[in-house]
């Protein structure tokens, strides 16, 4: 474990293996005034992200940086355990490829689950493409999103769907991050009126126009990527984030519905594990980390070859009641494509049915991620590992799809 100290807060990092860029990002966060008083804990899968660190957990009060939650609001895994003890991977692949759009594709007609959410309730509804969003429920996306069939040592079969809020989450996150920076670099109406009244009181009426011109913008107290919302914007962001989180859940459930119906599966257990959100009941932000409350069932995926950890939370307050959301990358996507070959990728996936191994998914190969031992050895204080489920089928859309 490492302890990092910034100007306004400190952080515990629950691993000894951390790259310099991640450390720099964490310290930059700890140097922001709105982090003062927060309990910041970094998960063992910590790695640098776009402006902020993946694997972040922190308590919040009345201010939040939208970028800390990120653009894929509500992203997570939907997991089901089947009554069936045998599946046909070729048929499953056909059902997925014919019934679940992936990559940048959306549905030609909305899934029936689209009726379960009203996007007009978004505070920023005029800033998002709601028609595209409704047609995106039941779509996988690309990158590290996946659909897997896994088996445990007792022969139980699980289906796991990993996806999030698609383009809707991106639009909401970008809107509020821009609004945050604009609010921090703009003088309020009250500040402008106070300046005018002061100039009048001082007999400096002739200077009013020049002063107003100089008050068009002010220096932000924080870097743009870490700009925060507060007050009414804070409440609006939380409201819209919860809708995006609901949207992401419906998206995963719609895909699972397509799979279960298409395959004729019988579900005997189902649970959700979310990793980009704010737990508003406990006011804990989790970016690339998951809830691990006492007795809570959760899933930690490792990579395409090694599968996932089925765990039960221990409710450890020192960990912010959290656990890592995965193994964490060893290298960037571009570096992975330079370091490995498709031939190596295919060898690593031997014994797992997949039609998704190729140049476009090379950045997602098992070798690009930390190993299972790197995570299992660090999470004992926060979860109990109940089982390791191994992939028998995997589907991913590449970055060129």
Predicted feature descriptions by range:
Residues 66-121:
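A generic, well-ordered mixed alpha/beta core segment in the N-terminal half of proteins
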Residues 46-47, 75:
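Acidic, glycine-rich active-site loops and adjacent beta-strand->loop/helix elements
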Residues 2-28, 35-42, 48-54, 58, ...:
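Domain-length cofactor-binding catalytic modules of enzymes
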């Amino acid at each position: 474990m490492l302890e990092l100290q910034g100007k306004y807060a400190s952080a515990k990092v629950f691993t000894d293996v951390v790259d310099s860029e991640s450390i720099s990002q964490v310290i930059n966060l700890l140097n922001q005034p709105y982090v003062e008083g927060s309990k910041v804990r970094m998960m063992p899968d910590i790695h640098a992200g776009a402006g902020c660190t993946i694997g972040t957990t922190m308590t919040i009060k009345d201010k939040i940086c939208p970028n800390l939650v990120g653009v894929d609001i509500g992203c997570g895994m939907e997991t089901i355990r089947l009554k069936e003890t045998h599946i046909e991977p070729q048929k499953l692949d056909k059902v997925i490829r014919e019934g679940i759009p992936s990559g940048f594709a959306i549905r030609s007609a909305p899934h029936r689950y689209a009726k379960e959410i009203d996007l007009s309730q978004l505070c920023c509804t005029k800033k998002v493409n709601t028609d595209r969003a409704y047609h995106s429920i039941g779509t996988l996306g690309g990158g590290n999103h996946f659909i897997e069939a896994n088996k445990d040592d007792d022969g139980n079969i699980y289906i796991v769907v990993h996806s999030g809020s698609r383009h809707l989450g991106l639009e909401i996150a970008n809107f509020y991050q821009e609004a945050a920076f604009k609010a921090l670099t703009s003088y309020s109406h009250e500040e402008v009126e106070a300046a005018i009244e002061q100039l009048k009181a001082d007999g400096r009426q002739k200077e009013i126009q020049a002063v107003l011109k100089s008050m068009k913008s002010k220096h932000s107290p924080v870097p743009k990527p870490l700009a925060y919302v507060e007050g009414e914007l804070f409440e609006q962001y939380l409201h819209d984030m919860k809708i995006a989180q609901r949207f992401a859940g419906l998206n995963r459930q719609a895909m699972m519905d397509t799979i279960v119906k298409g395959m004729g599966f019988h579900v005997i257990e189902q649970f959700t594990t979310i990793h980009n959100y704010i737990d508003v009941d406990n006011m804990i932000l989790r970016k690339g980390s998951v809830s691990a409350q006492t007795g809570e069932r959760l899933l930690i995926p490792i990579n395409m070859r090694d599968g996932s950890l089925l765990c039960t939370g221990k409710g450890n307050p020192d960990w912010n009641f959290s656990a890592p959301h995965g193994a964490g990358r060893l290298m960037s996507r571009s570096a992975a494509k330079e370091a490995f070959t498709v031939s190596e990728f295919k060898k690593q996936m031997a014994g797992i049915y997949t039609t998704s191994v190729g140049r476009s998914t090379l950045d997602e190969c098992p070798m690009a991620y930390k190993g299972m031992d790197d995570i299992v050895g660090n999470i004992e204080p926060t979860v109990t590992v109940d089982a390791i489920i191994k992939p028998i089928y995997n589907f991913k859309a590449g970055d060129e799809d």
